[in-house]
Amino acid sequence: MTVKLLFQLFQLYFLLIYSSLEVEFKCTEDRKPISVNLKLHNPTAVTVSYKVRCTSADIFRVQPPLGFVKPSETVSIVIWYQNQDKKDAISKNHYFAFYHTNSDGRTARELWANSKVEGVRRLPASFLSTK
């Protein structure tokens, strides 16, 4: 198997269902920070821990960046774009990586310090200009 095929298979195994296929920021001329709300749903019968990473910590913030989703529960995540230098953001292919692993009773921070990722899904970021 090629590395690309393995990566695609790994992306398919993702337990959490999210509310969007991309993270869309509606940029304004006033350069105020923009937030997008995403929802993660756990359709399984076990508690799952998630971790969200972004391509640039300088222009994005994720709240909360890690946590737990109980069985059949939905959690909200807010992703912020600083909206300071729109040209730099648009010129790069930014994305958010959502990782998950099974919970084992530790806190989320302890769990992600050395846990093996069981699934990942990447959502691309897009920037729309509102005039």
UniProtKB/Swiss-Prot annotation:
Entry-linked SUPFAM superfamilies: PapD-like
**From what superkingdom does this record's organism come?**
Eukaryota
**MSP domain location:** 14-130
- Please name the taxonomic classification of the source: Eukaryota, Metazoa, Ecdysozoa, Nematoda, Chromadorea
Among InterPro entries, the record links this protein to: Ig-like_fold, MSP_dom, PapD-like_sf
| Pfam hit, one | Motile_Sperm
Query: Which Cys pairs does UniProt list as disulfide-bonded?
Result: none
In terms of PANTHER family, this protein maps to:
MAJOR SPERM PROTEIN (PTHR21513:SF2)
Q: Which organism is it from?
A: Caenorhabditis elegans
Supply the name of the protein: Uncharacterized protein ZC262.1
